[in-house]
Amino acid sequence: METDYDVIIVGAGAAGLSAAQYACRANLRTLVIESKAHGGQALLIDSLENYPGYATPISGFEYAENMKKQAVAFGAQIAYEEVTTIGKRDSVFHITTGTGAYTAMSVILATGAEHRKMGIPGESEFLGRGVSYCATCDGPFFRNKHVVVIGGGDAACDESLVLSRLTDRVTMIHRRDTLRAQKAIAERTLKNPHIAVQWNTTLEAVRGETKVSSVLLKDVKTGETRELACDAVFFFIGMVPITGLLPDAEKDSTGYIVTDDEMRTSVEGIFAAGDVRAKSFRQVITATSDGALAAHAAASYIDTLQN
């Protein structure tokens, strides 16, 4: 069976780059295709503190660079293109991108997830003009300004801490009366003198003329609304899996791809790893584990095709 590669990995986050390392170690011809920047969600981590083996925390960016260097050193090729379709004919996968086409005997989908949108007035209108989903990327534009963070989970807390080093006016808006983040991150957030939390509050609208100037808030207990002046709004209210390339694969009730313990999807020859798959806990370490398992399973699958 003649193909360009043994395995093509879609996505160069922690799961994809881990899969690339293990695929290459299994002597598979490996291509990683990434439409944006390698690193995925890890790039948003200001300080990676809970990854085994790193006694001294490193930034998500540094971690991503290390992962890429390892994958390339093992022999992986990385193409920065956007995959448009994945098809299968006679046990061969055909992957098309905006600039070319490739064939492979197996595919590992490591496309991850993207930030959930609220769909409220002003959110899309002010994107890039005060509305953002990445504090690490856009925070420096609002140095010494008043910024609002929407959410109460790990991402919201972590990004609020990032912003607190750029400004002393960070206001978190959370619809509940306690943070949902891991205890250590939540405690660090609440102790930060530059971060204030408005509890039991929802965001109703983002307002402004040419850029963000305020937000409309609602007290979930009383129904009372009020306006809060600010310069930027950062949204961290959860993630949505990126599964459009695999519409026929089995998914759970929230849209994540269902796999078995070896990362096999319901489509033979396609494996899923990282935040795109259904699981109870999503961290960098679980993504890298998924990637290793997916590569191992892909190698076993290819063996069955060749023997």
From Swiss-Prot:
It comes from Treponema pallidum (strain Nichols). The keyword Disulfide bond applies. Its EC number is 1.8.1.9. The gene is trxB. Disulfide bonds join C134-C137. The keyword Cytoplasm applies. GO terms for biological process: removal of superoxide radicals. Binds 1 FAD per subunit. It is an enzyme of class 1 (oxidoreductase). Keywords: Cytoplasm, Disulfide bond, FAD, Flavoprotein, NADP, Oxidoreductase, Redox-active center. This is Thioredoxin reductase.
